[in-house]
Amino acid sequence: PTESWAQAASRFGDLFRMPHTWGIVILGMCCYAAFLSLRGLWLGPLLMGRFGFSLVQTGNVALVLSLIALFVPALFGRLDPGPLRRRRWLTTFSLLMGALFLLMAFLNHAVAAVVLIFVMGMLSGFGVLQYADVRSSYPAEMTGRALSLFTMAMFMGVAAMQWLTGLLAAWAQYHGHDPFRAVMLCIAFMLTLASTAFRWLPRSPLLPQA
């Protein structure tokens, strides 16, 4: 029989009644959002505003970054260490990405900034491990809904982070501060919080114990 909207909503609610869902959702809202906020919203203003890049130069950086981000998920997929170590990798890589944003906040050398942006692009591939973590964290009959919820969280996170960093940049500029530094610090802080939440909130009972 066809599932009603009420039944579908109720079963999504079942996911939130599982304690380990919260860590997965929080991390999911921040990792992809951090990279996409850089690539989609702040890359051009950062390179042109802080380093004086032309539109063509900025476009070249964006093209290379997009190509990197296109292929690195396959590499991380092949390197997937399995359910137990995967969570450690997710915690470590999300903290490392936060550290790179922190470094970007204070970096004033154009070539070093471009290299750092490309390193961020290479590291962004770890996000594919989050999908594998979702599959390992729920029983088979709930996997589809869990993946849907995770994907929704990712795109809600993108919208929220771009909105928040836009507000913060406007506030910083109004008060005479460097808007790009404020944005990078904000993203670094959010990644650190998300990684910490993922590390310490309950984990799925389906995963092997350490």
Predicted regions and their residues:
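Helix-to-loop junctions at the C-terminal end of transmembrane segments
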Residues: 72-85, 169
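Structural signature of the two symmetry-related core transmembrane helices
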Residues: 88-102
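Juxtamembrane intracellular "pre-TM" segments in multi-pass secondary transporters
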Residues: 1-25
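A late C-terminal transmembrane helix in Major Facilitator Superfamily
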Residues: 140-173
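Intracellular juxtamembrane helix-capping segments at the cytosolic ends
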Residues: 125-139
